[in-house]
C-alpha cells in the first residue's frame, strides 16, 4: 500500500472530509463554452434611465368620469410587442398603476442599471385617469366627490417597462421580477424569446387540444341554457378573461 502511495504524482488536490484529508489527483477534460455576445448593433440613448413621471396631468382642468372598468378588462391592444429593448415586465392581469408604483419602478431600476451599458423606457403613459373620493364621515349624496388622485389603467398582455443594452436576460431578470412582485396585478419578467415562446405555446395548445368540450363550443351551442348567464364579452373572448383576471389555462 505504501509503495502505491509513493507513486502518486506531485500535483494533488486536497479536500477536507469531516475529520480526515483525502488526496484527489487532478483531471483534465474537454469544455464547450457558449460564444460571448458582442452587442455590436446595440445603441444606448443619451438619457438611458427612466424619466420622472408627473403625479398630476399637466392639463388646465380634468373632468370627473365614471369608473369605466372596461379600461382594465380583457387583453391589451397597446404596448404588446417590443420596440427598442429586449427585456420587459409583462402584465398578466388588469389593474391600476398609482404614482407610487411609478416611483418604485423608477428608483429600483435606475439604482440597479448601468447607464453606460443599459437603458430603460416606459411603455405605459403617466397617470391620467382621475379617481374621486369623499371625505370620512361625509353624508351620502351631494354629487360626485372631488378628485383624490390619478391612475394609469393597464390590461393583460401590456408591457409596463422595457429594458435593453449590452446585457443578457439573466442579468436583469432578478431586478425585473423584484419590481413585478410589487405591482398591483400579476406580472413577470420576459424577454423577446420568452414572450414569443409563450405565444407559441398558446397556439400549440389551441391546435393540439383533444378536449371537444371547450368554453367556446359550450357557449356557442347554448348547452343547459348557459347563454342567459353570459355576456357578449364572454363570447368574443371565449371565457379567457373574467373581468380584470386572466385565465391562461383555458383553451
UniProtKB/Swiss-Prot annotation:
It holds the Pfam family Ribosomal_L16. CDD domains: Ribosomal_L16_L10e (cd01433). One of its GO terms (molecular function) is structural constituent of ribosome. This is Large ribosomal subunit protein uL16m. Its main location: mitochondrion. GO terms for cellular component: mitochondrial inner membrane; mitochondrial large ribosomal subunit; mitochondrion. Keywords: Mitochondrion, Ribonucleoprotein, Ribosomal protein, Transit peptide. Coiled coil: none annotated. It is found in: Mitochondrion. Residues 1-29 form a transit peptide. Belongs to the universal ribosomal protein uL16 family. One of its GO terms (biological process) is translation. The gene is Mrpl16. Component of the mitochondrial ribosome large subunit (39S) which comprises a 16S rRNA and about 50 distinct proteins.
